[in-house]
Each structure stands twice: as C-alpha cells, then as structure tokens.
Amino acid sequence: VKLVVTEKNIAAQKIAELLGVTKAKADKVYSTPVYRFERDGEEWVTIGMRGHILEPNFVPQLIYKKRGGWVGVDADGVAIPASIPDDLPKPPFKKKKPFIPEGVELGAWKMDALPYLVYAPIEKLPKEKDIIRSLKNLAKKADSIIIATDFDREGELIGSDVLTCVKEANDTAPIARARYSAITKEEITRAFTNLVDLDTNLAQAGESRQDIDLIWGAVLTRFLTIVKFAGYGNVRSSGRVQTPTLALIVARERERMAFVPEDYWVIKGDFNHGEMDFSAPHATARFKKEELADVVMEHVAGAQEATVASVEKKKRKVQPPVPFNTTSLMAAASAEGLSPARTMRLAESLYMDGYISYPRVDNTVYPSSLDLVDILKRISGNPAYRPYAEELLKKGKLTATRGKTETTDHPPIHPTNMATPEQLAPAEYKLYNLIARRFMATLSDAAVVEGTKVTLEVNQEPFVVKGDVLAVPGFRAIYPYGLKKNEQLPALSEGETVTFKGAIKTKKQTEPPARYSQGKLIQEMEKLGLGTKSTRHSIIERLYTVKYVQNDPIEPSQLGIAVIDALGKFAPHVTSPDMTANLEEEMTSIAAGSSAKEEVVTHSRDLLAKELANLIPHSEEVKEALVDAVAADAYVGPCPKCGKDLQLRTSQKTRSMFIGCAGWPDCDVTYPLPKGKIEALQEKCSTCGMPQIKVTAFRSKPRVLCIDPECETNKEPDLVVGMCPTCAEQGKKAQLIARKNPRTLKRFIRCENYDECKTGYPLPQYGALTATEEVCEHCGAPMVIVTTNRGPWKLCPNFSCPGKAEEAKKKEAKAAAKKSGKKTPTKKKTTSKKSAS
C-alpha cells in the first residue's frame, strides 16, 4: 500500500481523483476520511491532515535543581533541558503564585512568571489526536509513504510533523516528498513521477517562526492582559508582527491628527462646443489667497466666449502588468472590494478546485517550464476570454512581462483551468476573472495612450483641461482594472472659439495623508519585511478581531493607539518594524541552511527579554493608558439618571452587547442592542435627545438608531398579517399580529391567543413589513413581504416550515452542480395560495 498524506482533506480527495486509474473510493479510518484507489497495479490511499497536527506550547513548570540547574517539566513529569539566565531568581521561593517551593508555575498568568516564560522550553503536543491515530494506523500497513503537503514553510513543517508521527508507527517504510504548484492532472502526475526528499531546512525555518511567534505572542499578550483594567473584558492581544503593523496604522493616524489644514481656492470654468459640455480648471490649480482668485473671477465675469489657445497631443506607452504574486493579488483584489483575508480564502478554494495555481508565492517571473500556450487554450473555453486568447495565440512566440522577484518554488499565480460565472460563486468568479485577465495581460502588448492638453483663454485668463484616449488598447482591452476616468473632450483646434458658460470659485482645504487601505497596508508590510506572504492577511484580520482597528480605510481605535503609545514609550523595539524584519531575515537564512534554528530562536528570546525588562517596571502606567482608551472606545454618552458615562459592554453570560452605565452597581441603567457591528455616534437623536448608534448587520447597510427603546423613532404600529392556523385547526378564530418588543426592539408575529395556542414566528429585524392575503402552502403560516435596500422579499416566517428544508436541498444540489460544472434545473420559488380569511 502506498500512503499519500496531504495538508487538507479536500486535497486528499482531489489527488485521489486525479491519480487513480480506478474511481477513488471514500472510506474512513476511525473518524478520518481517506480515499482508496489503484494505480500501476498497486493499492493507494490518501489521507488529509487538518493543517498542523502538532502544536508548540510551553512546558507547564520550571524546576530548579542544585546539581542540574533549571529543567522544564512536561504534563507527564518528563524533564526537558532549560536554558534560564543566571540573573533570574532561583528557589527556594515562598509558595505564592506563580512560584512553588522548587520552581515556577508557567501556566499562571502572573507578572513574575513572564521573565521565565521568555526562556521556557517548548514541547510539541498533539493538536489533532484523531487524525494522528488514523495516520499511524495507515502508516503501519504502508510499504511507502509520500508527503504531499503544500510546498512552502508551513507545508514543509506540517510534512515534518507527519514524518515524526509515521516514523513512530513504521520506521522502515521509505518516505518521499511530492511538490506541486497546481491541482491539475498534469501537475499532480508530474509531481508524483518526480519525487524528492523533505526539505529539512525549510521545515526548521517554519518551526522557528512557530516558536518565535508563540514566545513573543504569549509573553506580550500576557503582559497586556495582566495590566488590563478589570471589568472591560477580553485578553489584550500583542505579537511579534501584529504590534509593529498596528504601529504603522497608528503612526499614519498621528500624521493625520497633527496635520493642520490650509485654505485654498480653485476656479472651474464651464464650456460648450457643439453639443458637448465640458469643464476646465484655471491654470493656477490652487490659489492660496482668495484675493487672487477674486481678481480672476472679475476678469472672466460677463465673458461669453473662450479661445482655444493651444492643443498639445502626446503619445505614451503604458507597459502591461507583471504576473501576480500573493501581495500584488491581494492589493488588486482589495481595490475591487475583496479584503485580503477573503481574497486568500477564495484563492485557496479556487486552487483546491483546480482553477488557479498555488496562491501563496513571492515569484513574479513565469518559469520556462510553464506552458503558456496550453493555459491560453484552456481558458479560451470561456466565451468572454476567447477573442483575446485566440489573438494572443496568433502571435506565435509569447513574451511575458517579468517582475523583480524570481524564485524557484512556485510560478506566479495564474489560471490552470477554464471557469465561467455559472461554475463559481460570484465572489469566486470575481477573483478568478481578475487572475485570468491578469495572466492574459502579462502576455499582451503595451497600450498606447494619447494625452491631450487643451489651453483655453477667457479674457486672457488661462483654463487648462487634460484628457487621455486609448489610441492602441493593447493589454487594456483584456485588463481594464485601475483605469482612471478622464474628462471627455470635444474635438478642438487651435484658434477655435467655444462658448464660455461661466466660472465657479470654490473654497477647499488641504487634506491629511490618507489612511491605509487593507491592500496598501499589505504592500507596506511587504516593503518593511513584516510577516510573510502567507501571514500578512491574517495579521490584519486579527487586528480587526481584537478591536485595535476599525473600518476600511483602516482607522485605529483608542485602544489600538493606547497599546502602541504604551509599548512604544517603554519598549520601542517591540513596535518597530526593524527588529521583526531582521528576525524574518534570520528565519529565511535557516531555510537557506546558513543559520541554525536554535541560534535564531535564542536570539529572539534575548531581544524580547530586554524589552520585557523595560516594560514590567512601568506596568501601572501601561494599565492607566489602557483603562482610559477602553473607556473612550466604549463611550456612548452621558447617563440620563446619574450623569456618568454610558458604555458599550459585553455580557459575561451571553456574550451579547448592551449599553450600561459606568456607575454600576449604584446605577442600574441599561439599554439592549440589536445584533451587528455597533458604533457610537456623536450626533444626538433629534426626537428625544438621547445618544445614537450606527448598527451594521450582516450583509446589510448601516442604520442609525436611537438607544432609547421608548423613543418614537423605534416604535412600529402593530400589523395584522393573517389568521392563526393552530387556532383554525381547533375551530377558533384568532389573528396573527406582527409587533415590536418595546424593550428589546425585536420583531415577531404572535397569535392574539398566544397564552393558549403558543403560535409565534420570528421576523427579520430590518425592513418595512407588509401583510399579504396569502398563506404558505407547506405550513399555513401567513406570507409577508419585507422590503429592504435590496428590494421586496416575500417569505414564510415559520423557521420549521417543511418548505425551507426543500429549498435548502435544492440550493445544495445547485451548489454541487456548479462546482462540477453541470447545469441544474431552474429553481422553483416557494409557492403560496390565497388565504381563506
């Protein structure tokens, strides 16, 4: 039996389908899915991991022995050598957490434990016990084992962990490595025909990153959490890459806050030629003094004609873009409305389904082994691409653009198979379309842009307008992304007269530096060496999760600013990108074989120890900064009862948000909150004067609400939507009424005889509600219409309606058919019939 081990279950399934001579048979070993098939007369089986199957953690205890010095002790009592600095206190200690008579309890989140935690030994523990058990069961029976995890640092580390586990079960079976850049039949066949050895150096580089991130993340997070203000909830997160990334965002915000806007004036003239209106700004783009602008306005006042003083035309070439690597893909997708984190999730899905190549790459140069002609032929199956692909194929020899980064592990991101909008979900196709068009653009000719500059004179005052025209579309025919809209100009000749319709003077102010978009931040992180192609998007996502940042473009919260200010004041190297970038370089040197893992990890421990020594004496000052910041972020307005702050709070029991008074328990004022992202607003309710909030529910536009449930703006009249089907079965007549709870603001439908029949249905919380005279044919509940920004939506409000299960099955079938490229019958809408009432 040949055993193939992949990083994920879906990869195991796909590889089995692509390699098998016979159809792959799905099976289970214990609870883990496996796929069996035959190839070359042998039995093969594939099994997928769930990412990392082992995870690093600190030993729970450090013990000091007079003869042997410090040792770490794992959960089973096994001693692990430890290298603890001599300047840290040694036992005997008084029994007071985190200390025990003979050592230190590292599990205790206490300030005194942190200097020891920096140097504590790290052990690898099983993370996926069921999968490991299944893996070992298969390994025992295997004649040979092939590791087929992703080919990058993380994939090689997972492969190394797999190697450790399988050797415990079978230390004689030969083990090889399959490396591939796309999940297509050709690429997988090539990889399994040309097996190599596991790259130990690359795996060690991955393990060093894992260990360093654990050490820095655990120590800094525990420090911030220990000093946090009790009552404001969660762990305060920090990390080796996360913190300097946040520092970039805060530094930009500081620039904006320090920016002093200056007034200036602009003058825009309106013109007409033939049937086309157009506008042109004055040749002086900005007037710093209003008096100078007024002089121009006096000169042109009353004028009705303008003369075309000059028409200048210049042609310039615009070169096609270079191939996508991970960073440039995330930046381009961000400009199209896809966040970096979502882009990578979609890219991973497209890769697993065989539509694009491996999406985590630095390379921007297509290797000579990549068959560009074959890829063009494949994607030309999409009618939207066919004319462009065929035009490129007619060129004969294809010449691709080249970026600055060339690596040998994976090619740049490119399409590997044809896809159409019918085969993919809208967001998936949006990303696939971007990648496919970029690929064709890299093989296309330069675009030629003809720039036109027209100078018009009105009573000797010059107005200048510029416009660009694509003289030769080149790559822009297939890749329109990033095109700027230009002023449309009529055909004008020097000396011509055009109609002058007047001028407008507008006062403006200079703008502060723009906040980072997620795409721009990804690019800045790459430039500064923060994180890797595989981690940058998740670091940004983490900053949002822990509420250090909000919105896009990215704005730091008061808490995010306070964390950077506190750490930057007492431990500036923690917030600087330089130290993190240097550590990244050292980890890269491990992969190259020029540095050892232990040497790099020890260096990182020493750096952190110095920063921690600066932080601990100032923990009270850090605490005060965090207290003020959390309170500022949580502030909603003054309490109407006691005058103290109303604050956004999280319930310890339900984890749902509410508004509570900072004077609790002396003041018991609270207000419920609807589900969704909540943001306090400065503007007060115009009806009752109470604070307002902005609520953004999932997949909905933001709404502004008054926090007081008793406010008239929160009330809705009761609406009769039909007759109760439960009462009707018992020969009674009772109405179903839609109403809004005055306390929670939740909407629902209930029978007026609810105490007896208990019939009730939930309702969507947003949208105008309209009754119909129809009932659901499946359950008899009244059909209602909810009108939102997306338009009207007719629904049965009964969550237990049998028709909903049928709809769900149809959706699943349609989704499955989309994935396999098959067409499905048109879905029938839920039908209704006229109510008898």
Residue ranges with predicted function:
Residues 1-3, 165, 221, 258, ...:
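Basic, low-complexity terminal or inter-domain segments flanking catalytic cores
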Residues 1-216:
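Intrinsically disordered, low-complexity regulatory segments
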Residues 41-47, 51-124, 233-348, 352, ...:
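Long, highly charged, low-complexity internal segments
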Residues 120-123, 149-151, 169-176, 196-203, ...:
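Short, polar/flexible loop-turn hinges at active-site or ligand-entry regions and domain interfaces
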Residues 141, 183-269:
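C-terminal or mid-to-C-terminal helical accessory/interaction module adjacent to the motor/catalytic core
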Residues 149-151, 331-333, 360:
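Short glycine-centered, acidic/aromatic-flanked micro-motifs in structured strand/loop junctions
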Residues 181-186, 326-327, 346-356, 539-542, ...:
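Short, conserved phosphate-binding/catalytic loop or strand-edge motifs used
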